[in-house]
């Protein structure tokens, strides 16, 4: 052995050390001197000596038995629950509650999971629905403004009387086209939202005759729709009334895949930015104030806030066709500034 004595040593090492101490004491060394040479605390040596006499020199296994540890019968009940209810409950969380529901054992979900893992058992779980293939845009869609609108609702729960806000964002230009505050999510709100958006973009006038004379509209007309509305699979999006309204106004519908919010990323991103950058909206309780604030935020979002996804111009710039010129002016300005700095720092002969 060499070096300091570790904090834990086995019984064989202790026996060797105690033998060295005995030999040194017989040779006339004091206990303190030999312990100092061995870098061993004297109290530790005395404790080993007493344990050697009692036959307990070997350390007990590390750890202990916590006073809140499971009892044997509880572990047995967990395993029994697995056999009886595992195929029904499918998860350790439900199985833990099944134990108390049946009055057999009261344990937490993590305890059930740990006991089953220790026994090499595994619950089948509920398989995730397979993610479908993303549908491509229809062939008639063009990558320009007012061709792709993405829409969805968000919730502002502090405004109890009208907590739901619908919004539409233009996928190409990222303009926040329209928004309405309402108390419920039905096809009626969808109609109001889209009529407001169409009017704001100057598209409603050409479609008004369809609303005035719906009986004269040929719903089987194969002419390209005026635009494509992208949404998730909410009830008001899929309802027959909404479908009929969209068909009347020649608005195509495109639904994202279930459990895949990325398919509606444009509107999800809009609401995320709105709430993160304007947290006061989440504290407003008066619907009239909330509606005014949302309209103010919408105006700022469209005309002031620079949007990264469209090259750091405002959505209004992109929507009105100024985006390319602004981005070009920046590139030209950067190049000119670089040349000016080089000229200023270039040493003169």
Where are these regions (language model features)?
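Short coil/turn helix-boundary motifs
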Residues: 24-28, 85-88, 201
């Amino acid at each position: 052995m060499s070096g300091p004595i570790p904090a834990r040593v086995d019984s064989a090492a202790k026996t060797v050390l105690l033998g060295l101490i005995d030999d040194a004491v017989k040779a006339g060394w004091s206990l303190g001197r030999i312990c100092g040479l061995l870098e061993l605390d004297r109290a530790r040596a005395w404790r080993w000596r007493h344990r050697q006499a009692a036959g307990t020199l070997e350390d007990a296994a590390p750890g202990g038995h916590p006073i809140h540890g499971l009892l044997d019968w509880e572990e047995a009940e967990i395993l029994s629950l697995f056999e009886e209810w595992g195929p029904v409950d499918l998860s350790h969380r439900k199985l833990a509650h099944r134990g108390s529901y049946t009055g057999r054992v009261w344990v937490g979900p993590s305890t059930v999971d740990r006991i089953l893992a220790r026994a090499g058992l595994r619950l089948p779980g509920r398989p995730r629905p397979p993610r479908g293939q993303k549908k491509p845009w229809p062939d008639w869609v063009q990558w320009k403004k007012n061709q792709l609108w993405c829409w969805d609702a968000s919730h502002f729960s502090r405004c109890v009387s009208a907590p739901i806000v619908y919004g539409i964002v233009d996928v190409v230009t990222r303009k926040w086209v329209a928004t309405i505050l309402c108390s419920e999510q039905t096809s009626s709100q969808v109609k109001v939202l889209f009529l407001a958006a169409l009017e704001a973009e100057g598209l409603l006038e050409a479609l008004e005759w369809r609303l005035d004379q719906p009986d004269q509209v040929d719903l089987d007309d194969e002419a390209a729709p005026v635009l494509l509305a992208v949404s998730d699979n909410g009830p008001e999006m899929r309802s027959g009334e909404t479908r009929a309204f969209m068909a009347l106004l020649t608005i195509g519908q495109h639904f994202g895949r279930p459990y895949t919010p990325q398919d509606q990323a444009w509107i999800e991103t809009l609401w995320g930015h709105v709430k993160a950058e304007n947290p006061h909206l989440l504290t407003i309780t008066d619907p009239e104030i909330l509606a005014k604030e949302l309209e103010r935020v919408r105006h700022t979002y469209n005309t002031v806030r620079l949007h990264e996804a469209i090259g750091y111009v405002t959505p209004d710039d992109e929507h009105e066709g100024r985006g390319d010129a602004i981005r070009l002016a920046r590139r030209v300005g950067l190049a000119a500034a670089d040349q000016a700095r080089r000229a200023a720092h270039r040493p003169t002969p």
